[in-house]
Regions:
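A conserved hydrophobic helix/loop-capping motif in glycosyltransferases and polysaccharide synthases
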Residues: 2-18, 25, 38, 111
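Acidic donor-binding segment of Leloir-type glycosyltransferases
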Residues: 22-68
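Glycine-rich, basic loop-to-helix element that forms the pyrophosphate-binding segment
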Residues: 69-86
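Short aromatic/hydrophobic "clamp" motif used to bind/position activated sugar donors
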Residues: 91
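Conserved donor NDP-sugar-binding/catalytic core segment of glycosyltransferases
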Residues: 99-142
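Active-site-adjacent helix/loop segment of glycosyltransferases
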Residues: 129, 202, 206-307
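A recurrent flexible, glycine/aromatic-enriched loop bordering the glycosyltransferase active site
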Residues: 153-176
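Acidic donor-binding loop at a coil-to-helix junction in glycosyltransferase catalytic cores
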Residues: 193-199
Length: 307
């Protein structure tokens, strides 16, 4: 029924904790899952493959595929690799700096089942990228997984299957239907680190699918986990890490402009969902001239090791 994609670039501790929370949640729901674990060229001393192998040993009754990229793929690459190897009808992608709960999985599966047009379903969190309207912060700091689980359950109890539609995709933890993947393929690999999800959301909209947020689904998000890890290990200041990130965002935006023939803005100013909404409105007239499906290029398999 469910394929679960978890990418990791370094930080085995975060990764193992994330995988443990997923395994606990799906086991409580008696779900048989296919795990697709993608090592994004992590340093050998980070022991990501060891964390993945330990998960395979723990995940009795589930199928686990382990894929390692020899080169850094970043967001669009690891997501697309995961989609290439996922085979189930429903696919869940999650960043490795998150903790999920049984209530979260229940909620996104429930909302996804409400309509065949719901191509992508996300949830809420204590920390959300580009979607401040989906941020739900606990009144007090949650110190244990039991407290996280209890808070998530309270959000589910209060909101059940309530949902709202989104115009822009920020894809840190999302559920996708196989029908969507068959229609628009994987993420466009011209977008290395950023704008891959925005482009994918645009293509989903243009293909007739809806992006929705399950308001009863809540997970814990550490936020920028791999960035914080690399800052610590590469002795980068916050300003240096921010400038490096924004340079990558600008490069990706210029690719987005080129793909969708956008004259303005000439420079991405760091914006967010508001600008992305404007992009969607402006690219809609180009839908008939633009291929919506992007297939995983066979040549990309050359960079991968399968375990």
């Amino acid at each position: 029924m469910l394929s679960i994609i978890v990418p990791a670039r370094n930080n085995a501790e975060f990764t193992a904790t994330c995988l443990g929370s997923i395994l606990f949640a799906v086991s409580r729901l008696n779900l048989n899952c296919e795990f697709v674990l993608v090592d994004d060229a992590s340093a050998p001393e980070e022991k990501i493959l060891d964390a993945f192998r330990q998960h395979r040993a723990n995940a009795i009754g589930h199928q686990t595929k382990i894929v390692r990229s020899r080169k850094h793929q970043h967001y669009s690459g690891v997501f697309s690799i995961g989609l290439r190897f996922a085979t189930r009808d429903i696919v869940f992608f999650i960043s490795n700096d998150m903790l999920v709960t049984t209530s979260f999985i229940q909620s996104i599966l429930l909302v996804s089942s409400l309509s065949r047009d719901f191509g992508i379903v996300r949830g809420t969190s204590n920390y959300t990228d580009s979607h401040p309207e989906h941020t739900v912060e606990p009144k007090e700091q949650l110190k244990t997984f039991q407290e996280i689980d209890n808070f998530s359950r309270s959000v589910f109890s209060a909101n059940s299957c309530r949902y709202v539609e989104d115009k822009v995709l920020s894809g840190d933890a999302i559920l996708l239907k196989r029908s969507l993947i068959e229609r628009i393929g994987v993420l466009d690999l011209r977008f290395f680190g950023y704008f891959g999800d925005i482009d994918y959301g645009v293509r989903a909209h243009l293909a007739g699918f809806k992006l929705v947020c399950a308001k009863g689904a809540w997970l814990f998000h550490e936020g920028s986990g791999h960035v914080k890890h690399e800052m610590a290990h590469q002795a980068l200041s916050f300003e240096e890490a921010r400038d490096r990130r924004m340079a990558m965002v600008e490069t990706a935006y210029q690719e987005f402009r080129k793909k969708w023939h956008l004259a303005t803005p000439e420079i991405w100013g760091g914006g967010g969902s508001v600008e992305a909404l404007h992009f969607f409105d402006r690219v809609r007239p180009r839908a008939k001239r633009m291929p919506l499906k992007y297939d995983f290029p066979p040549s990309a398999m050359d960079d991968l090791e399968i375990y």
